[in-house]
Amino acid sequence: MNVIGQEFQPIAAIATTPTAAKLLQPICQTLEATLWIPNFCQKTVNLSLNTQVYTDSLKNHLVNIWPDYNAIIFSLASGAVVRLISPLLQDKYHDPAVVVLDEAGKFVISLCSGHQGGADKLTNILAPLLNATPVITGASHNLELPGIDILGKPFGWQRGEGDWNKVSGIIARGETVQVLQEAGSILWQKHLPHQHPFYFGFPKIGEASPTPKARIWISFTQHQFSPDLDLPKVQWHPRVLWVGVGCERGTSKKLIATGIDKIFSTHHLAVRAIAGIATINIKADEIGLLEFCQEKELPLRTFSAELLNCVEVPNPSNIVAAEVGTTSVAEAAAILGAKQQQDINFQQGYNNNSSPIFEQGEIRDNKQESKLPLQGELQEEKKQLKFSTNLLVSKQIFRLEGEPGAMTIAVALAEKEYTGRTGKLLLIGTGPGQLDQMTSAAKTALSYADVVIGYSLYIDLIKPLFNPGQIVEKMPITQERQRGERAIELANFGLTVAVVSSGDCGIYGMAGLVLEQLRASCWDGKIPAVEIFPGISALQSAASRVGAPLMHDFCAISLSDLLTPWEVIEKRLIAAAMADFVVAIYNPKSQNRTEQLIKAVKIFLEYRQPENPVAVVRSAYRENEEITLTNLDKLLEVSVDMLTVILIGNQSTGIYNNWMITPRGYLG
C-alpha cells in the first residue's frame, strides 16, 4: 500500500458527473480510495477496480456509507455537500474528514472535521496532486500553529479532559497560554513560529511573566479541573506508564481492568498514559490479559524469569521465586517494560524481541520473548537496571469479590513515550529547487510528513510548502550521515519523516545512504516503511537549460574523493573519455578540493579536441543561476563550485545559436 494516506483509510470519493469522476480517478488510484459514481456515468467513465456504482439517490447512498469511511472526498458544490451531510453530522470526534473539490480541480476545501478527522491534512495532501489551491480556514492554520486538539497525535499522546473549545479560542486570539509539560517529546516546542502564544513552565522567583488566559497540561497524572475556574485547562497524556502485572492463572479481564483503574485512581495517574502491559513470559497466553490488551489496544511485553530476576526491586518475594523462578514479576516487568521503551530506539515491533503486540485491535504475529542478555552480562544488566527507571507505584495486590483470580500491579515511568505508530521514511527528491519543478507526488509526500530533515539550503528552497505543526530540522552540508541517522531514529519512534535531497534523491542523494544505514541496523524491510519519490536530477536540469546535450549515451561522475578514492575516479574519467560518452561532472570543486578538475580536464584533452563543447551550469532554475557555454580547453577559466554541474559533450556535440546539441545518431 502507498504509505501516503494510510491514516485516512478507508477513503471514499464521490462524483456526480463524468467530469468529476475523471478528476477523482487518479486521486483514488494514488490514495487507494473507492470512487462512487451514479449509474448514468458508467457509459462515459472507464470503470476501474476501485470504482463502484450507486443506484439510489446520493442522499440515501450517503446514509448507507457514512459510517464506513474515515474520509470522504466530494467533487461537488460545497453548498450541496453541506446540505447532504448536515443530517449525518454528530461531532468532530466521530465525523469523517470531509473535503470538497471543484470540478475544474482548482481548489481543495477542508469542509468538516479539519483537526480530529484530518480534513486539513488531507486537503494539503490532495492539493499538490491537482496543482490546486488548498483552502483551510481554521484559526490555528492561519497562525501557523499546530491545532491544540491534535498537538500530541504524531507522538501517540492521548487527549484528556478539559475545555478544548475555550482553550482553542484563546489561542486563536493570540492570548497567553501556559504549558506545563511533565512528560513526552518536546520536539513540538522547538519548532513553533517565532510569534506564538505559549509560555512554558512556571515563572522563576522574581521573574515577570504574562498572566496566562489558559493552561495546557502534558502529563501522566490525572488532573481534576473545576468547571467554575476562570482559567480554562486541557490535558494531554503521553503514553509513558508501563504496568507490570502478575496474576493467578484464570484471572478475569474484569478483575485486571478494575484493578488497574483502582490503582491509577488512588495514585492520581491517567489511564490514558498507559504505554503497555508487561509480565512474565509464562503469562503470554493468559486469556484475561490478552483480552484486556486487545480491548484497550495495548502492547503486551513478556520477559523471562531469568531477566526479571536481574532487576533490583523494592519488594522481592521468595514465595514468588519458588513459583516462577524470579523474586518479582509486577515490579520487575514494569521496570523492564519502561527500560526497553527507552533502549529500543522506539522501534515498533521490537525486532521480534517482545511477545504479541496488539496494534489497532489485531494481534501481530510476534512470538519471541524479550531478548536475554548473555550470561556474562546479567550482573552488569542488574547494576544498570537498579537506576534505570522510576518505579512510580510499587507492588499492589488486588482481588475483586465475585471474580476469579488475583493480581499484583506495579507502574513504572519510561523516559520516552510509546507512540503506537509505525514510522515511515519518505525519501524525497526536490528537483533543482524551483517549486514548479518539483513533482506533485514529492509535494504530497512532503505535506504528509510529521518531520522534514535536510541540508539547510534545500530546506530553505522548499520552505513555502511546509505546514503548521511540522517539525523541520536543518543540518549543515557535511552532515549527511547525521541526517540519515536522525531520520531513522525519528521513524523508529513512530513519526513520518521526509528526508529531502536536491535533484533526485537516488542520484548522489540521501536515498542510498539511508538505505545503507537501515541495512546496517538489520532492518526487516518493513518497519519503518520506506517510500522513495524521485525528482528532476541536477544533470537533467542543467541539460534543459542549455539545449539537448544528453541525446546519446552519457554518464555521470563525481569528482569528490571524500568517499571514493581518486584512483577509482581517475579510471572512470579515462574510460568515459575514451568511450566518447557525454559526461556530467558533479562536485567539480570545493574550497578544499581544487586539483581534481584540473586533472579531469587534462584527461579529457587526451581523448577530445580542445574545442569540444562544454556547458557549465550553476544553480539551475534558482535565483542565482549561472550558465556558461565554452570549450574544453577554456573550461578552467570558468568559476565553478559544489553547486555546479559540468556537461562535457562527445565528439558529435555542437553549439548552434547558443544551444548545445548532441545528435541522436552517433557521428563521431
Where are each of the predicted segments found?
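Phosphate/pyrophosphate-binding loops at sites that engage ATP/ADP/AMP, CoA/4′-phosphopantetheine
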Residues: 260-274, 437
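Class I SAM-dependent methyltransferase SAM-binding "motif I" and its flanking Rossmann-like core
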Residues: 509-579
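Long, charge-dense
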Residues: 92-147, 280, 289-329, 533-539, ...
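Conserved anion/nucleotide-ligand pocket segment
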Residues: 126, 130-194, 566-613
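Glycine-biased, low-complexity coil/linker segments
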Residues: 349, 361, 376-377
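Class I S-adenosyl-L-methionine
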Residues: 2, 7-26, 32-77, 82-86, ...
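C-terminal edge-of-domain segments
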Residues: 212-229, 235-236, 333-343, 387-416, ...
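A contiguous loop/helix-start segment that scaffolds small-molecule binding in enzyme catalytic cores
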Residues: 184-210, 220, 318, 425-427, ...
